[in-house]
Amino acid sequence: MLSLKTLLCTLLTVSSVLATPVPARDPSSIQFVHEENKKRYYDYDHGSLGEPIRGVNIGGWLLLEPYITPSLFEAFRTNDDNDEGIPVDEYHFCQYLGKDLAKSRLQSHWSTFYQEQDFANIASQGFNLVRIPIGYWAFQTLDDDPYVSGLQESYLDQAIGWARNNSLKVWVDLHGAAGSQNGFDNSGLRDSYKFLEDSNLAVTTNVLNYILKKYSAEEYLDTVIGIELINEPLGPVLDMDKMKNDYLAPAYEYLRNNIKSDQVIIIHDAFQPYNYWDDFMTENDGYWGVTIDHHHYQVFASDQLERSIDEHIKVACEWGTGVLNESHWTVCGEFAAALTDCTKWLNSVGFGARYDGSWVNGDQTSSYIGSCANNDDIAYWSDERKENTRRYVEAQLDAFEMRGGWIIWCYKTESSLEWDAQRLMFNGLFPQPLTDRKYPNQCGTISN
């Protein structure tokens, strides 16, 4: 747990002097070596792992998402006609239960949903990295927060140990900011966009600095090869200049100047277009070890859902070519096999699905595209749907391996098929081994 006093001290000590730029790469080396501390850090474009990042997200574990673990939220159901009374996110989950009961249910979830055998399976299936989301409240809360706090960190540390034991690398992902950075349920608090309010920004900065300091220490650098400063900030509704100047840049300076670490930082693209970040934290200005994280889905708008499979694949391939000339390293930190939004609560509790026309959000509605019946039962999938899903997955893998690689969302769920890498592999919809291709060169390239 962190204190607000620590925050003030930390913020006051952040230096404004940039770290020594990393030397030019030795043509014979796949890694940079920083002059000051001689430590190596991972070059996501040039093979420091010996292959592209091929990872999985550990979603729905240390930060709840209703569609990943619906049983935790179904426990609140009072009728079969609608979702009234069901909490929409972890904030309301804890608020409805009270901290003691919420703590009991969450500890049961944390101790069972992922165990070391899962990480052994991940490694045996050929993946090389796990991205682990966690919310700010795991480390510090606002005065009126209902969240359970102070316990998740030990599970995160345990997971890093599991990863190390199985030769997996880790991204630690700050997935939820105080006040919420995007209003999504996956931030912990739906329908709020108050991340950059001064009090919320101060708490989130304090938490981030704690994460940076701890997981950039020598004991973690063999396994933790990136820290994501904040997941999916909703750029179109945020003050981007304030986020850059008051959150992202100070985090970099704290990491390089105070901690003296060569840890890689991950910046989500904030839903901005390709090349938007090219002039931010540039090598010419002395910055290094910066990776841009792009997330790609084609299911959260009706026009996307209406695309033919060939159109889906064309868009996926453009995701790869679109980042070829971005100046920073780039990785696709989230994508999915999904071609529908049928999974219950994918669009959040109470909203329905656009695909079958049941989606309602205020006065916004959707029109029927196709049926969602038996969506999570592979026995009801046609051969064409199976082939299309496999084609789409392979196209995305090829596209994302044009640069630094990919991290699928997510490794497992309680019941979803389209969003569960385990089920996808079991049913032949996701390649095993990961380099296997039934539909090679869909993007006009050969995968690594």
Curated annotation (Swiss-Prot):
Disulfide bond sites: none
EC number: 3.2.1.58
First-listed, main subcellular location of the protein, grouped into a coarse class: secreted
This protein's UniProt keywords: Cell wall, Cell wall biogenesis/degradation, Cleavage on pair of basic residues, Glycoprotein, Glycosidase, Hydrolase, Secreted, Signal
Residues cleaved off as propeptide: 20-40
Signal peptide: 1-19
Residues carrying covalently attached carbohydrate according to the record: N165, N325
An individual GO BP term: fungal-type cell wall organization
InterPro entries named in the record: Glyco_hydro_5, Glyco_hydro_5_CS, Glycoside_hydrolase_SF, Glycosyl_hydrolase_5
Membrane-crossing residue ranges in chain numbering: none
Top-rank lineage group of the source organism: Eukaryota
Active-site residues per Swiss-Prot or TrEMBL entry: E232, E334
Reaction catalyzed: Successive hydrolysis of beta-D-glucose units from the non-reducing ends of (1->3)-beta-D-glucans, releasing alpha-glucose
UniProt-listed PANTHER family: GLUCAN 1,3-BETA-GLUCOSIDASE I_II-RELATED, GLUCAN ENDO-1,6-BETA-GLUCOSIDASE B
Purpose: Glucanases possibly play a role in cell expansion during growth, in cell-cell fusion during mating, and in spore release during sporulation. This enzyme hydrolyzes both 1,3-beta- and 1,6-beta-linkages and even has beta-glucosidase activity. It could also function biosynthetically as a transglycosylase.
Other observations noted: Present with 4280 molecules/cell in log phase SD medium.
Protein name: Glucan 1,3-beta-glucosidase I/II
Organism, scientific name: Saccharomyces cerevisiae (strain ATCC 204508 / S288c)
Higher taxonomy: Eukaryota, Fungi, Dikarya, Ascomycota, Saccharomycotina
